[in-house]
Amino acid sequence: MTRLIPAALVAAAFFATAAQAADPVTTPSGLVFQSLKEGTGASPTARDTVRVHYRGYFPDSGKEFDSSIARGQPIDFPLNGVIPCWTEALQKMKAGGKAKLTCPAAIAYGSRGAQGVIPPNATLNFDVELISVKGK
């Protein structure tokens, strides 16, 4: 018999590395990047394909809008095919690393929002783990 673990518990355990957290850094684009765990593998370039676990939520309410953790399946994607916030942030990480991102609307979904889930001009938070960089 398979036991199901509530997604909130999995997410809490998954990102329970705050004790290792570095101070947040704000980049010129407005990205607020906080390393929670330093990775030891390769860092991706914008042209690489990466495998990531993530949880996206609104900073004001904490309401989750998407989570690969809740689905139990990391995602693979070319780094130059996602929102600019992710392209910038994941290049600051190494495989095995975890980080918290705050993405202002200008480098997230902007004035268009996304598919009725993310309103226009929304600032977004993401907890991300860079699992691997394909081919590195």
List PLM regions with ranges.
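Cross-family detector of peptidyl-prolyl cis-trans isomerase
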Residues: T2-K136
